[in-house]
Every structure is written in C-alpha cells, then in structure tokens.
Amino acid sequence: MRAGRRRNLLLRLLIGLLAALCVGALLSQQLTWRLDTWIYDTLLSHFEQPADDRIVIVAVDERSLSELGRWPWSRGVHAELVERLQRAGARGVALNVMFAEPARDDPAGDALLARALAESGNTVLPVMAEPVEPGGMLIEVMPMPPLIEAAAGLGHVDAAIDRDGIARHAYLRAGLGSAHWPSLAVALLDTHAGTDADRALPGLRDPRRRQAAPYQWVRDHHIMIPFAPHGAFAQVSYLDVLDGTVDDALLRDRWVLVGATAAGIDQGLLTPLTGGGPRLSATEYHANVLNALANGQAIIPFPGPRQWLLAIALALLPLALYSERSPWRRPWIVFAVVAAGTLLCCALMLRYGRYWFQPTPTLAVLAAGYVAWTLSRLRQSQRQAHSDALTRLANRRMFDLTLARELKAAQRSGRPLSLLLIDVDHFKHYNDRYGHQAGDDVLRRTANVIGVHARRPRDLAARYGGDELTAILPETSAAAANALAEAIIRDVRALRIPHLGSEIAPWITLTIGVATYDPKRESGAVDLLQRADAALYRGKHEGRDRSQRAAGAAIA
C-alpha cells in the first residue's frame, strides 16, 4: 500500500511538473495571445466604463475644415483657440497638433501661438517618433523651440497597436534611448496637479528599459485602457469654440483635448469596443487614457512572476482536488469547476482589481490534461477488458484471441509456435494452510516471473484459469520453449516462497507442460491445448517441479 501511495505521489509530481512547464511555455512564447485578447475584449465590452465629465474634446471636424479652410491652419488660429480656452477657465489643454517647423509664410502666427501658450500656462504639446526614411532610424519629432519654451509641458502621442491592429494598451512614459517623455494624458494631468514628472505612475515596468540603444523607442509604465463607449466624452467643434458659440461653463475647470476627428486628417484607431462601428480618433484615444488615470481605473497587466504563479497554481488545482475517495470523484467536474474558476478569477480581477490575468494558458493545460486523463482511462479500460485483475497478465479471452491469431500466422509462415501451460504445485494445499490472500500473492509473484521471460513484443503471458498460467511463444522452437520453461521453474524456486505442506520441496514449485504447434498433428488451438495439457499432467504424474514436453514435439 505504501509503495502504491509513493507511486501515486510520484506520478502526481511528474504530472504537476509537466503541467507547470506547459503553462510556462505558453506564457513565455505568447502562444495563446489571440484567445487571451478575445477573452479580454469580450469582458471589456461587458464592463461599461463611464466617461469623466471633466474631459472635453475640441474636435477639428469636417464643419471646422469647411469654414476655416484647408488643413493646416494658420498658427494664429490655434493661438486664438488657446486664448479662448484660457478665458473660459480650462483646467488644462492638450493641443494635439504637431508644430515641428516654423511656418514659412506666417511667422506672425508662430509668434502669436508662442505668446498664447506662455500666457495660458497650462497647455501641453505632443512629441512623436518617426523614421527618417521608410524603415530607417527613428527620431523624436518635437515642436519648434519657441513653442517648447512656451508650453507647459510635452507628452508623447505613441498609440500602442497590437499585432491584430487593435489599440488596447498605453505607455505612460516613452522616448528614444530612455522613457523620458510622459504620455500626453500624463503631461496634461501634471499641468493641473503641479506634480513632479518623476511622480509614481501606475503601470507595468519594463525591466529592459535601462539597456536600450540610443535610437530605440523605449516604453515604460504599461497599462491597458478601459475604453468608454464611442462618443461618451463631451465633444464640441473647434469652430464653435472659436466663434464663442460654446458656453464657458462647458469648458471651465475641464481638461480639454484639441485634435482632429475629421476622416481626412485622422485615420482613426480600432479598439476592443469598435466592432462594426466608427474608428476612434487619436484624440479620443488619449482622452480614454486620461479618463483611466484621473479616476484610478487604469488596467495593469498582471506582473510576470505573479501571472506565472497564479496560472500554474490554477493548472495544478485538479491534482489537489481529485481523489477517487473524495467528493470530487468525477474528473470532468473537477476540470470544469477549475476552468470556470479560472475564468471567474480573470473576470473579477479585471472588474474589481483592475488587473489583467491571461487565463488561456491555464485553460489550455486544463483541457489537455482532461483529454490525456480521458485517453488514459480508455486505455486502462481496454487493458482491464483484456487482463486479469489479480495477476495483471492477459485474461482468458485475450489468450484465446491471441492463440487463434498466432496459429494462423504460424500456418502461413511455417515458423514454430510454442505454448506453455503452468501449474503451481499443490496450490490447494497452500491455500488451505496459508490462506487465500497468501495464495493470491503466490500467483502474482509467479506471474511476474513469467512476464519477465515472456517479454518479446508478440509473446503473451496469461492466466488460463484458477492456479493455471500460460504463455504463448511465437516463433519459438520446442527446445527454446523448454529452456524458457526451465528458467521460469528455476526463478520461481529461487523466490523461496515457503510451502511446508508440499510433498516436493519446502517452497513453491511449478510444473509446466510444453507443446509446439505441428501442422501435421494439430488442426487448431484445441489440439495444441490438449497436447500441452497432457504434457502438464504427465509432468505432475512424474513428480512435479519440472517441465514436460508434449509427445511428438520436435526438438529443434
């Protein structure tokens, strides 16, 4: 029993180790990324994120373009907008328009914009990275120096796009060589809070950020965005703000993001909530980042070590719960409960903990484990249908099927086929003296010896009935079969199993009848069995503890 428990424990440890390695491989290689993102998108679509009414978008829309002319507009127009927002009492302004070079034909507009930025004191401008040439080295594109000096801050506008083209993430700091620029949303928050740029930010840190090359775009403070429904943020037209149509109360003490929404300027972004609807403008993307940060709702990818530990722990849970003696006797219930628990854990962590835990590696290992368990049970059932429960040798049905098959093979090939019938000497006396449990142990130990010798792929050791065992030996001559029988007798005798009631020896002995198929004598299995049985009883009659060839068996 103890050995059985040790084997069971060792098997569980090996299965647990394999499951942990599989989870680790799936996580490290991101092999379940598509399923994980599908689950994330589905959950996110069911958790409505309210839009903060302190956030207002001033849209460069089609109507503004129609009235104010072709894009880009004079910087004097933008200066007028900044002044208008300052007079309305905006909390902070993000002017998401790039002014990288002086306007060749409008230097006055540049000066007006610089003055308006300086006077407002709460307007931030964008920074972006773009290649010098297609596929070339990246450079940071920043506003021209007078505007940098006048602006309250700069923020990068890098929108993180996944491999499927969907924007789910944001990085709160980024830059070339090091993550030195805050995101546009962080820069906008800092204009009102007056906090240091190095303040604690949420998000997953990048451990590789310190080893980046000088011209590598580095991202840090990784978050996932809980998007509000499309159109949830208050939005007014650039033109309406400029001509005073918009009431100051709508802008007072608000974070204002100014940017393009017109399709000709902004191509838009796909998000988990897009579906078949319109794309999200870049400005609305940054509004969602601001919304998450302002309300402490940013979603953090579950940190790597904790993701691994929780995923592996959940994958190993069926091993801890399942036992044939426990209430969890049905494995499909165990696997179903753990799988449902994994999804529930994922959903609750996302909804209330604001952490994203990837569930699919655990679910994949659970599914694979259940399939493997089912296949193992099927194989075990097949073995039980063809094996003897006590000796673990083949049962009588399997013996009959195998003997018939091997006889046909011997008839076709002309190769010899030998059969051993094995009897434990004075087994009834042994049972009477030592009890049936001891008798069962004798049969098991004898069966083990037979299995050691009849070990070729086509050999079959079986329990013929009662205390009689047998072995089918394809392509084995009478002499070879007799030698094998003698070896079995010798090895069982060497076990020194006490048998004080035996008239032959003080330990267990065997008598074996050996018959080799002769196509001239036998017409089938019955004849071969009768010859082996006759040899067995002749061996008993001659004193037992021996092997006896059937009459007429060929020696070679």
Predicted regions span which residues?
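Conserved metal-coordinating catalytic motifs of nucleotidyl cyclase and c-di-GMP turnover enzymes
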Residues: T391, L420-D423, G466, A532
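A short pre-motif secondary-structure segment
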Residues: L460-R463
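Non-transmembrane functional regions of envelope-associated proteins
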Residues: R6-A213, L251-I299, P303-P318
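Short helix/loop segment flanking the catalytic signature motif in cyclic-nucleotide metabolism enzymes
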Residues: D105, G109, V442, A471-D491
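Catalytic-core segments of nucleotide cyclases and related cyclic-nucleotide turnover enzymes
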Residues: A478, N482-E486, E503, T511, ...
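Conserved nucleotide-binding and Mg2+-coordinating catalytic segments in signaling enzymes
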Residues: Q382-L401, I422-H436, R444
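Alpha-helical scaffold within the catalytic cores of cyclic-nucleotide enzymes
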Residues: A447-G451, A480-L500, R531-D533
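Short regulatory alpha-helical coupling segments
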Residues: Q382-R383, R396-P416, A447-R455, P474
